[in-house]
Every structure is written in C-alpha cells, then in structure tokens.
Design a protein with these regions (language model features):
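Acidic/aromatic-lined carbohydrate-recognition and catalytic surfaces
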Residues: 1-112
Length: 112
C-alpha cells in the first residue's frame, strides 16, 4: 500500500437503519435497526469512493440489550446492565456472536 490507510468507522445499527423518525431512548420495536445484509457491494463501493481503504464495523459483536429473542434462545439482559433500550455496542456479551438486532434472520445471523 503506497498511501496511509483511511479507516471508515461504520455502526450498522444506525448506518443502514431506514427509520427516519427514531425516538431517543426508544425500543427496538420503535426505532428498528440497520441490518448487516444492507451493507451491500454498492454501499462499500460508495465508502471506497470517499477515499476509505478499510471499514471498521462497530457494534457488531453481541452486546447487552433489552430486546427479547427468547424464541431464538437469546433472553433479554437485566435492565440494570443495559444502557438505554438498545444497549451500548461496547457492553459486549459474547465476542464470538453477532448482535441479533443486526440480522434479518436471527438464527442465521453469522452467515449474514
């Protein structure tokens, strides 16, 4: 590489969220979430056109949340350890899993 790397930090929860009327402190049901599937080749090409050489995905790792995915075997966390409703992407629960909010198909979230 002949030039310095330029890193584009991308928070999928916000970057690809199509809800234009998010409520501060709102729930997943109220605000929704961007999805990993929405980060397409076109999106990545657009980031590259900005001059970025790398993408740093933030908030992808499973973190504490109040969202209930019990049907998929993921129970909500104790509200005392969750920041707001959506949780902080820095409150990591499992370094080897993906945040289910970012998946279209929660059971297959690792493939997305």
């Amino acid at each position: 590489m002949d030039r310095k790397p330029i890193i584009y930090q991308l928070l999928p929860r916000l970057f690809t969220n199509t809800n234009n009327h998010c409520i501060p402190g709102g729930t997943y049901q109220q605000n929704g979430s961007g999805k990993m599937n929405d980060i397409t080749d076109t999106v990545l090409s657009g980031i590259k056109e900005l001059g970025a050489t790398h993408v740093w995905y933030t908030g992808v790792i499973e973190h504490a949340t109040k969202t209930d995915y019990s049907a998929e075997g993921i129970t909500p966390d104790n509200p005392h350890v969750v920041k707001g409703q959506a949780g902080s992407p820095y409150a990591i629960k499992d370094y080897y899993d993906i945040d289910p909010d970012l998946a279209v198909d929660v059971k297959n979230r690792m493939r997305e």
